[in-house]
């Protein structure tokens, strides 16, 4: 239903039932947009939910609507806002913006002194990031931890990243520095 209320909130353990649906939608959405995205596993989504590092959107009837999660890097110096996805039938209703605001606030509350970054190829995410105070940066200004870059291996554009020595790719890196904001 179009007028059904959507609730955006921190994920709870019961939300692990959405993990398969979340990863399927992430992959199909990336294919439909023709953009690269690092593939996630259901286990990684469950891990984020169980660790209190995820935001979920659901209808009041318990239908999955959207998701995003955070991850820390370089010993907590950086936090990434990642995996923002909204189910196709609930897009263009402001859900992504609400999820983005919540995941940003979760990052700030859990890791107040960490720099927050987002790597995206989507204009909508770039606009949301800009509204929150993120600025475009080079890849050299975000996490350097090899584990972060290993996650890019499943992206269709990984060869571009490698050929550029992890200095740039087709995605835009955006950074929020709490010292400047």
Specify the residue positions occupied by each region the protein language model found.
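Terminal substrate-recognition subdomain of acyl/acetyltransferases
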Residues: 1-2, 84, 108-111, 117-181
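A short beta-loop-alpha structural element at the N-terminal edge
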Residues: 5-21
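Amide-forming acyltransferase catalytic core, primarily the GNAT-like/NAT-type
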Residues: 14-15, 19, 28-36, 168-172, ...
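Alpha-helical elements of Rossmann-like donor-binding domains used by nucleotide-donor carbohydrate transfer enzymes
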Residues: 18-22, 44, 98, 102
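Surface-exposed charge patches
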Residues: 21, 105, 127
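A conserved beta-strand-loop-helix scaffold within acyl/acetyltransferase catalytic domains
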Residues: 24-27, 33-60, 64-88
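Conserved acetyl-CoA-binding loop-helix of GNAT-fold acetyltransferases
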Residues: 86, 92-107
């Amino acid at each position: 239903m179009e007028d059904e209320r959507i609730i955006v909130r921190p994920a709870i353990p019961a939300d692990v039932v959405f993990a398969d649906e979340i990863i399927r939608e992430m992959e199909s959405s990336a294919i439909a947009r023709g953009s690269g995205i690092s593939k996630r596993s259901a286990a990684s989504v469950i891990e984020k939910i169980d660790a209190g590092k995820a935001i979920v959107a659901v209808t009041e009837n318990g239908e999955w609507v959207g998701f995003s999660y955070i991850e820390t890097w370089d010993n907590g110096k950086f936090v990434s806002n990642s995996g923002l996805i909204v189910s196709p039938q609930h897009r263009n209703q402001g859900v992504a913006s609400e999820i983005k605001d919540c995941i940003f606030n979760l990052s700030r509350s859990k890791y107040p002194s960490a720099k927050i970054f987002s790597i995206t190829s989507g204009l909508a995410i770039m606009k949301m990031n800009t509204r929150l105070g993120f600025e475009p940066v080079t890849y050299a200004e975000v996490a350097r931890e090899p584990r972060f870059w290993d996650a890019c291996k499943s992206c269709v554009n990984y060869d571009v990243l490698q050929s550029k020595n992890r200095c740039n790719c087709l995605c835009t890196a955006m950074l929020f520095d709490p010292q400047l904001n």
